[in-house]
């Protein structure tokens, strides 16, 4: 099973790695704790629920307070489920990873609001001239005529863009800064600054050529 850690995105910077400058995303990581173990017999599937982040107890609602009290833990800010192994109450941090390994990062992308087909689906658009009149950014036809007399499900149209779960595969873990509780991951990571992200072992495991 893949090892996984829950942290928060800090932002992007760049560091020197050998003779080249590497763009990295800093992810703040504090101690993670297993707050629940999902079992097939009771829940129908097998997962670990991990939690992290400090939160003012006055801001925790009663159901969540009861959930953590049942596990014998103080409330945490973020909760996520991961496909990993462990026992209730287990604590772990950045030490589960090694510098240079490949990881997958899961986060929620920034919301862009209602967007047209050119921005949302990279449609080409309509010609700027040659008789085109106020159709420049329209999607064009969305289906045939009397057959089938409907628009097929899944047809790409305008709609809300972003604010969805995104996984970026095979990013290199450049540096582990245990003193400051930071993981530096090469490249961009989904989400805005302060949003929770899951860092896990790369499931595809493609070797990286340095």
Swiss-Prot record:
Q: Which organism is it from?
A: Tropheryma whipplei (strain Twist) (Whipple's bacillus)
Q: How does it assemble?
A: Part of the 50S ribosomal subunit. Forms a cluster with proteins L14 and L19.
- The molecule here is called Large ribosomal subunit protein uL3
| Family listed | Belongs to the universal ribosomal protein uL3 family.
Question: Disulfide pairs?
Answer: none
- Tell me which SUPFAM superfamilies the record gives: Translation proteins (SSF50447)
What InterPro entries would the database entry show? Ribosomal_uL3 (IPR000597), Ribosomal_uL3_bac/org-type (IPR019927), Ribosomal_uL3_CS (IPR019926), Transl_B-barrel_sf (IPR009000)
One GO biological process term:
translation
Drop me one GO molecular function for this one. structural constituent of ribosome
Q: Where is this region: Disordered?
A: 126-150
Q: Tell whether Ribonucleoprotein is among the UniProt keywords.
A: yes
Cellular component annotations (GO), alphabetically ordered? cytosolic large ribosomal subunit
Alphabetic keyword roster:
Ribonucleoprotein, Ribosomal protein, RNA-binding, rRNA-binding
Q: What does this protein do?
A: One of the primary rRNA binding proteins, it binds directly near the 3'-end of the 23S rRNA, where it nucleates assembly of the 50S subunit.
């Amino acid at each position: 099973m893949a090892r996984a850690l829950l942290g928060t995105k800090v932002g992007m910077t760049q560091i020197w790695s050998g003779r080249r400058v590497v763009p990295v995303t800093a992810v703040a990581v504090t101690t993670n704790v297993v707050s629940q173990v999902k079992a097939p017999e009771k829940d129908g599937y097998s997962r670990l629920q991990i939690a992290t982040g400090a939160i003012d107890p006055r801001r925790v609602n009663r159901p969540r307070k009861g959930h953590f009290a049942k596990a014998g833990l103080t409330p945490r800010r973020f909760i996520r489920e991961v496909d990993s192994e462990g026992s209730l109450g287990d604590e772990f941090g950045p030490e589960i990873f090694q510098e240079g390994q490949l990881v997958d990062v899961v986060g929620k992308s920034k919301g862009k609001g209602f967007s047209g087909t050119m921005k949302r689906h990279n449609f080409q658009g309509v010609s700027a001239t040659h008789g085109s009149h106020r159709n420049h950014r329209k999607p064009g036809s969305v289906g045939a005529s009397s057959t089938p007399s409907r628009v097929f499900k899944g047809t790409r149209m305008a709609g809300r863009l972003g604010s969805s779960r995104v996984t970026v595969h095979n990013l290199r873990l450049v540096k582990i800064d245990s003193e400051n509780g930071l993981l530096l991951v090469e490249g961009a990571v989904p989400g805005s600054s302060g949003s929770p992200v899951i860092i896990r072992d790369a499931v595809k495991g493609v070797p990286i050529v340095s």
